[in-house]
UniProtKB/Swiss-Prot annotation:
PANTHER family: 40S RIBOSOMAL PROTEIN S14/30S RIBOSOMAL PROTEIN S11. It comes from Francisella tularensis subsp. mediasiatica (strain FSC147). Located on the platform of the 30S subunit, it bridges several disparate RNA helices of the 16S rRNA. Forms part of the Shine-Dalgarno cleft in the 70S ribosome. This is Small ribosomal subunit protein uS11. Belongs to the universal ribosomal protein uS11 family.
Length: 129
């Protein structure tokens, strides 16, 4: 019996020179997503997915490692210039931006897009430890 031969087309990676880096830094984790201008994700990494667990996920070093991993994957698409959108109150905000700069990505602008309520929902009660 003859084997059926399948011709598979290789997926062509598109070249994107300008991108947007979305950095979401919470108190527990840091998520770095690099998208094109339309918002289609090119690469992403988290500090939890980078091998950090527990309280080490929320450290600036974990955010730096996550940003470096996301930048390495984005460089395969030919990304050179990056606008940075930073969201959240976490400790990994600055170190993630610095890590993108070190990876030969030219940071063109840094914008803080943290949502602030105009006295909306009631916040959770304070912790008593």
């Amino acid at each position: 019996m003859a084997k059926s031969v399948r011709s598979s087309k290789k997926k062509v990676k598109r070249v994107v020179t300008d991108a947007v880096a979305h950095i979401y830094s919470s108190f527990n984790n840091t998520i770095v997503t690099i998208t094109d201008r339309q918002g289609n994700a090119l690469s992403w990494a988290t500090s939890g997915g980078s091998g950090f667990r527990g309280s080490r996920k929320s450290t600036p070093f974990a955010a730096q490692v996550a940003a470096e991993r996301a930048a390495d994957m984005a460089l395969e698409y030919g990304v050179r210039n990056v606008d940075v959108l930073v969201k959240g109150p976490g400790s990994g905000r600055d170190s993630a931006v610095r890590a993108l700069n070190v990876k030969n990505l030219k940071v063109t602008s840094i914008t803080d897009v943290t949502p602030l309520p105009h006295n909306g929902c009631r916040p959770p009660k304070k912790r008593r430890v």
